[in-house]
């Protein structure tokens, strides 16, 4: 009698296990399918479920994620993704293996190969159990958080290592409300390269930001608020950017808020981080910052005849705010939009009157 009861319990458990496994597998397939859009494609060869009785695993073979925009597309490829599902099915460990290939297609196609001494792992949490996912749900709707931690990632291009990412810690959290979506992003990493491909050889980044989106339909959202709790970037052990602040965004209007900057060795920071093809020249940007700190005058800012290098070269550290309002974007008493227009007119006058 006891044997029959145990056998019935075993058979019932096995039937329930296979039914649950089948449900979860189908839900994963639907989640992937529903997550695709004009800008996102997800491909794979097969999805297999294993791990009887309590070690549930989903193995996705030959996965490929393709991101598409109006300029180019990127593909992320690895051999397998192994998903270890917790008993509650609201948490899963992701194992991408030791290798990820990133293909960039555009005017100049290239490939990055990401290698790790150990497997590239992550942890994902869901706002509902995987066996309760509806047929219309997508990954965006059920994902609560994704966390990645890796000691060392080596990035190769054309079979040559171009840089390393050490001590990577990445976390993105999402909280859905009836009318809005809140996203928090945390990133900490160390960058190192023997080649000076980014104008610096080593850098550290510590970032914590949050975004608030207003829902506008099922797939659309409008950014309402950006809060930068901290953005600390150091490079070559000599230059540093410390940024924090909040911005509110409105339709057809300038944003409102204040961004606070602290720059250490700011002359070097501007040279290393800013490209040449932006609204202002690097020399003008340095002089604008110097003027915002009351270190120079309007005459020095608006003339090319004076040597402004002596003005900003004497400033090692800079601390200033950039204020956004209906009146424009101000740094100190200067309106950057007016400065942009003035510099554009000056360049046109120079072109029309070269002598």
From Swiss-Prot:
The protein's name: Uncharacterized protein RP198
Signal peptide: 1-21
Keyword annotations: Signal
Domain of life the protein comes from: Bacteria
């Amino acid at each position: 009698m006891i044997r029959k009861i145990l056998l019935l319990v075993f058979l019932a458990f096995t039937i329930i296990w296979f039914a649950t496994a089948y449900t979860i597998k189908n839900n994963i397939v639907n989640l992937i399918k529903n997550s695709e859009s004009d800008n996102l494609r997800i491909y794979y060869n097969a999805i297999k479920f294993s791990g009887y009785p309590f070690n549930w695993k989903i193995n996705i073979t030959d996965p490929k994620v393709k991101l598409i925009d109006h300029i180019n597309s990127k593909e992320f490829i690895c051999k397998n993704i192994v998903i270890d599902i917790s008993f509650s099915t609201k948490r899963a460990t992701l194992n991408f293996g030791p290798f990820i290939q990133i293909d960039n297609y555009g005017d100049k196609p290239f490939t990055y190969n990401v290698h790790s001494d150990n497997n590239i792992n992550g942890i994902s949490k869901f706002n509902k159990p995987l066996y309760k996912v509806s047929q219309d749900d997508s990954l965006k709707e059920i994902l609560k958080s994704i966390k990645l931690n890796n000691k060392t990632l080596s990035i190769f291009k054309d079979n040559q290592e171009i840089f390393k990412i050490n001590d990577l810690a990445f976390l993105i959290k999402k909280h859905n409300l009836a009318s809005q979506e809140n996203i928090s992003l945390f990133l900490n990493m160390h960058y190192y390269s023997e080649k000076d491909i980014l104008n610096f050889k080593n850098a550290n980044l510590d970032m914590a930001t949050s975004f608030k989106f207003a829902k506008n339909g099922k797939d659309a959202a409008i950014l309402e608020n950006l809060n930068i709790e901290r953005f600390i970037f150091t490079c070559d052990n000599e230059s540093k950017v410390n940024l924090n602040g909040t911005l509110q965004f409105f339709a057809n209007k300038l944003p409102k808020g204040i961004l606070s900057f602290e720059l250490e060795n700011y002359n070097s920071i501007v040279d290393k981080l800013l490209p040449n093809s932006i609204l202002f020249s690097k020399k003008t940007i340095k002089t604008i910052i110097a003027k915002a700190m009351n270190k120079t005058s309007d005459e020095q800012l608006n003339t090319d005849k004076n040597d402004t290098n002596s003005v900003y070269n004497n400033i090692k550290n800079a601390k200033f705010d950039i204020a956004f309002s209906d009146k424009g974007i101000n740094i100190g008493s200067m309106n950057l939009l007016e400065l942009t227009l003035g510099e554009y007119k000056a360049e046109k006058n120079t072109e029309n009157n070269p002598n």
